[in-house]
Amino acid sequence: MTEEMSKESPPPPPTSFSSLPDDVALDCRARISRFHYPTLSLVSKGFRTLIASPELEATRSFIGKPENHLCVCLRLYKNPNPLWFIFSPIPKQKLKPIVPWFPNQQYPQYPTVVSNGSQIYIIGGFVRRRRSNRVSIFDYRTYQWRRLPKMRQPRVYPAASVIDGKIYVIGGFRGSMPTDIENSGEVYDPKTNTWEPILLTSLDLTVQNVFKKKHYFTTKACLVINKVSCLLYVSDGKLYWREDKEGFECRKVYGLAEQSSNLFRVVANSGGGGRVTVWWKSMTKGCEFDCLLTEECETKIWCAEISLERRGLRELRGFVEWSKEVFTIDRCDYIYDFISQYVTVTY
């Protein structure tokens, strides 16, 4: 036996995506959670092109892979602009920053945020202490920010809702409504990329009913339990609820004894139906009164997902599905309302 024959043959090189047929490679990538797309887009220019391609979305739709993702906007100490994060699914359960950041401009104060499929709309708000008519949009399919045409009127924290794919916006003025009724409300049509006025007196019943049931509070969540709309909110660090109608008494959510030591600060809708997420902070590593100057402190943001069960007319019981630290800040962060907005994107 010769020396060459005695040597073992080297193992074959691993199969790469580039060696697969295009349709097979496309099908494989379509089955990967969108949460990993930002990382995949860093692999190569070819990956970035494919992730933004309509063919990938068409394949995902064909194989039935829509996903709900909870997105939160955090206000952090010493950061002039809030930062948007996407909440990773089980098992990681971590906040992952959205890249790129908000475009090079001041993030508005008190905007209204709504979602439509894979897109997040940042509507109005204060920019340099003045009401703004700007509308920015972030698309999770392409991971890009872009600016929409300006609204007809500057608005701060207006009522807004997505109806039949169009963005309806009402109010948000200083004091009472403007004397010009045509400017009190407007609607954005993505197909024409234009804003058009709407008359409040001419809104159909569907639009009116949607706005009556709409809630615009970052510290509250609204969901349907046993076919009844319920409003949940945080008060004094605890979770409370009431039916979403006038005259119904507010009551504490039972079953959360294991979380009694945690002071909840925010409640948000979860990506799944019939559940909410509650958020709170903890500070460690010798956090003293002057830690804001020394920064010898660590702040942790925690989240728990709670499923809810209605028991009779007067009791709502919560069940903790999981509870976990989701984000760490290497300093003290005393901002109380650290979640300024949240939405759920579906795509």
UniProtKB/Swiss-Prot annotation:
Query: Where do the F-box domain residues begin and end?
Result: 14-62
Q: Where are the Kelch repeats?
A: 119-165, 167-215
Q: Which domain of life is it from?
A: Eukaryota
Renumbered residue ranges of the record's region Disordered: 1-21
* Pfam families assigned: F-box, Kelch_FKB95
**Keyword Repeat listed:** yes
The yes or no answer to whether the keyword Repeat is present is: yes
Keyword field: Kelch repeat, Repeat
User: SMART domains recorded for this chain?
Assistant: Kelch
Write down what this protein is called.
Answer: F-box/kelch-repeat protein At5g03020
Q: What is the lineage of its organism?
A: Eukaryota, Viridiplantae, Streptophyta, Embryophyta, Tracheophyta
